[in-house]
Amino acid sequence: MITQSALEMRDALAEGGSLIGLDTGTKTIGVALCDREWRFATAGTTIRRTKFAADKAQIRAIVAERGVKGIVIGLPLNMDGSESPRSQGARAMARNLEDLGLPILLWDERWTTQAAERAMIEQDFSRAKRAERIDSHAAALILQGAIDALAGSAF
């Protein structure tokens, strides 16, 4: 199941469980994870993209290791809410991960990378550390927005 509705995702995850958040780019995939109660999203690793089969294998390994019950993928939208050319890449990622058998939520990722960078600057991350971790921190912001909606605190 692939959806853009937090309500549909929440229904599919009636028993809760840990979620994985993905910020997909052309060169990297930022990964974040949340707790089983959908309270806190934390930045995880960054996957350097190679071939999709290898990327998927890394995601599958994280899903299995962490007992993930659902996937949240950042959906790049234009400022007016319309889909951008990059949106198709996120949708393709969702279709390719669908055979993992987990519900997938496409979540608006507007401004997450900029917000992650500002937060990292405020925390005095060096430029090199920001470049290394920006995608996983953006994934955490995407996932946090989604779990806030899933938990009912934002619709």
UniProtKB/Swiss-Prot annotation:
Q: Which UniProt keywords apply?
A: Cytoplasm, Hydrolase, Nuclease, Ribosome biogenesis
Q: What is stated as this protein's family in its record?
A: Belongs to the YqgF nuclease family.
Q: Which GO terms describe its molecular function?
A: nuclease activity
How would you classify this enzyme at the top EC level?
hydrolase
Q: What is the protein name stated in its UniProt record?
A: Putative pre-16S rRNA nuclease
Q: Where in the cell is it found?
A: Cytoplasm
Q: So what EC number does this one have?
A: 3.1.-.-
Q: Which organism is this entry from?
A: Novosphingobium aromaticivorans (strain ATCC 700278 / DSM 12444 / CCUG 56034 / CIP 105152 / NBRC 16084 / F199)
Q: What does this protein do?
A: Could be a nuclease involved in processing of the 5'-end of pre-16S rRNA.
Gene Ontology, cellular component aspect: cytosol
InterPro entries, sorted: RNaseH-like_sf, YqgF, YqgF/RNaseH-like_dom, YqgF/RNaseH-like_dom_sf
Q: Name one GO biological process term.
A: rRNA 5'-end processing
SMART domains in UniProt: YqgFc
